[in-house]
Design a protein with these regions (language model features):
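Single conserved hydrophobic/aromatic residue that forms the stacking wall/gate
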Residues: 245-256
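Solvent-exposed, extracytoplasmic
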Residues: 70-82, 169-212
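Extracytoplasmic/periplasmic ligand-binding sensor regions of membrane-associated signaling proteins
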Residues: 59, 83-85, 99-174
Length: 256
């Protein structure tokens, strides 16, 4: 009788353990599906922005003389068509002087364009399109004194100016809301977990508790994600919290 009772207890524990593992696996699978879906949405939005940037470069900047009416019209049309995602688009010459911008706005005084990270990155690696981390746009005057959060795309480009070939830097500021809205949606529908997005260097791009992070009231070990290559992982951050990381590209990491 005692042996049978022990056997029943052991079998019960084994069944419970397997049931618990099955539940944990289901939870992880569901979480992976959510993360992968989020990554797909972010990639689609960022690919769209990249295509808008390429359109500005190849179909406008390199297609028309910057002094022509066609250039002005097409530059304006490109912005107006994509104003739901684009905060502004601007073209600068090799000395950092503004050639064109949409929407048309006054430059802020004492802004040293050539010292901006997006400008320096474009100059240092002329064949690449560079994505910045989120920041407040400080290039143009805003009559309503609003602070616009953006992610900047920049690249060194060829500029048509009469018979003289020149170079410059094309800047497209994507509205930060493009990323924020996707991340906010999955966080609003999550149950007891949260998702954040960081860069390849561990810099925070989006966090649902971003205000607390900025004030030092909350900490996040985003550097842990920089150790991993493309894929989905389970890790322990700070020796306690179980996290799942999905890396779609070397530049972005969605972390739970």
């Amino acid at each position: 009788m005692a042996i049978s009772l022990v056997t029943i207890i052991v079998m019960g524990l084994l069944l419970y353990h397997r049931f618990k593992l099955a539940l944990e696996k289901t939870a992880v699978d569901n979480t992976e599906a959510t993360v992968e879906g989020t990554v797909d949405r972010l990639n689609a939005d960022l690919l769209d922005i990249r295509q808008i940037f390429n359109g500005a470069n190849y179909n406008v900047v390199q297609q028309f003389d910057i002094s022509s009416r066609e250039f002005v019209e097409q530059f304006s049309l490109l912005y107006e068509t994509n104003s739901d995602k684009v905060q502004s688009v601007a073209l600068y010459d090799h000395e950092g002087k503004l050639i064109a911008s949409e929407p048309v706005a006054l430059e802020k005084k004492n802004v040293q364009v050539q010292t901006q990270e997006w400008y320096k990155n474009a100059e240092n690696a002329i064949e690449n399109v560079h994505f910045s981390t989120p920041h407040i746009q400080e290039l143009f005057e805003d009559g309503a004194y609003r602070y616009q959060w953006v992610v900047s795309l920049s690249s060194y480009v060829d500029v048509n100016k009469g018979e003289i070939p020149e170079t410059g830097v094309l800047l497209l500021d994507m509205k930060y809301s493009v990323i924020r809205d996707v991340m906010k949606q999955i966080n609003d529908s999550s149950d007891g977990i949260y998702y954040y997005l960081s860069s390849q260097d561990g810099e925070m791009i989006y966090h649902p508790r971003g205000t607390e992070l900025n004030r030092g009231l909350f900490k996040e070990n985003s550097l842990e994600a920089t150790k991993y290559e493309n894929g989905t992982y389970e890790i322990r951050a700070d020796g306690q919290n179980l996290s799942l990381i999905h890396i779609s590209e070397p530049t972005r990491r969605v972390v739970i």
